[in-house]
Amino acid sequence: MKSVILLSLAACAVAAPTAGVETIHDGAAPILSSSNAEAIPNAYIIKFKKHVDHKSAADHQMWIQKVHGEREDERLELRKRGLFDSVNDAFTGLKHTYNVGSGFLGYAGHFDEETIEKVRRHPDVEAIERDTIVHTMRYEEVKKDECNPDLEKGAPWGLSRVSHRESLSFSTYNKYLYSAEGGEGVDAYVIDTGTNIDHVDFEGRAHWGKTIPANDQDIDGNGHGTHCSGTVAGKKYGVAKKAQVYAVKVLKSNGSGTMSDVIAGVDFAAKSHKAQVSAAKDGKRKGFKGSVANMSLGGGKTTLLDAAVNAAVDAGIHFAVAAGNDNADACNYSPAAAAKAVTVGASALDDSRAYFSNWGKCTDIFAPGLNIQSTWIGSKTAINTISGTSMASPHIAGLLAYYLSLQPASDSEYSLATITPEKLKADLIKVGTVGILTDIPKDTPNVLAWNGGGCSNYFEIVSKGGYKAKAQADKSSSLLDSVTELEKAIEHDFRVISGKVVKEASSMTGQAEKLSEKIHQAVDEELKHFFGEARV
């Protein structure tokens, strides 16, 4: 029986093909095998040589079908005689034909050894490879943004507030949750009294843009602009800690100026932004995401200032402006009434509207504005605590810069973030905390700014939408309790710090007791002032 099988296979091997001009040659094509894949028995992929055209390929495939058919007829006869296992000796022949562009002509099939030997020795065949099992690539589940924020301890309460949904408590009042990349690639124009650009909190990211008033110096002689700049982009005091700050001085040291100078400052910012856009598109500035501007100033209603601000927004600048400090309708003030800017009202530590803050339908959003600590003038380390919608607005300018920097990278590393000021303004309001504030007049949006809790996935933040504050039966009482709780927490922190100072002092001098008394007196005075303001 064995000799019959061998003779039959031998006879098949020397049988000449009958299809067309197919011939056999001595140089056989290699059979390739993968060393790290599971091969399928008797399954092969065949690639033709480059000279083979479509007609020759079709002729070859007809030939291999004929060879395979003849082999199957012979095996069928042997099966009838019980000489082959009908299950283990099944060959299906031609499976696929390939014509991949102009670089790959071939076919695949399931052939016995004798047939594949004929294929190997065919002059049109370049290579043969054993077919193998393939699998999907190993993958990891796509995880949603787990929101692993950076944490700034000992942060100003305003920063803490914009990074938490609920009212501040013992565990959150001085903790700012943020994304470390916040502000990167963004220019912030602070149109104000100037900026102390040498302050250490700016880490060299503050620059002098332009002094608009004639015959004035390139310094901040007031402090207001420096304070705003620190809230926008300071390392400790800023919302967007990697933004570049540009001082645009439009007000003199006494804090006043002319509307024409203010409009000139807006014009400067718009032109500077346009120049940076061109630089980015020309490949001269890498990683530029866009520009924001803050204007914590204002006066009576003026159509042209509002028009200038709106035009700057149309030019691509994301603009934040203060609502005003007269406890009146913001629509009666400029640039608070500029429709395309983000007009910002001020909130207090207890989540009430700050007693001085303007309100009304022209107010878009609220941000912390009472007792805000930030950078100041007089030295490279000076700080000051002041209040106003002037302090609320830079929280929003910083937040606009922060959100701009979180925009996903575009195809070109030099391209701008594609989000428009109109869209970002809408998103900013959309994700805000709704209904948390008290003493909000009718027709005034009850929305407090939020930075996404430190998450860096912008679309994840926006897709979740806004957050409606939990209802409270007696919110005024609850908020008073919150302030009392915070008072105890902050006082505790002051006491701990002063205790450490006294401990150090006792090892150096016998005046520790007197020093301790002075420290506690200072703490008591500071707390009395701070919470007196917070309870107004």
From Swiss-Prot:
It is an enzyme of class 3 (hydrolase). This is Subtilisin-like proteinase Spm1. It comes from the Eukaryota. One of its GO terms (biological process) is pexophagy. Glycans are attached at N254, N294. InterPro entries: PCSK9_ProteinaseK-like, Peptidase_S8/S53_dom, Peptidase_S8/S53_dom_sf, Peptidase_S8_His-AS, Peptidase_S8_Ser-AS, Peptidase_S8_subtilisin-like, Peptidase_S8_subtilisin-rel, S8pro/Inhibitor_I9. The gene is SPM1. Residues 1-15 form the signal peptide. The active site is at D192 (charge relay system), H224 (charge relay system), S390 (charge relay system). Residues 44-137 form the Inhibitor I9 domain. Residues 16-147 form a propeptide. Belongs to the peptidase S8 family. One of its GO terms (cellular component) is vacuole. Its EC number is 3.4.21.-.
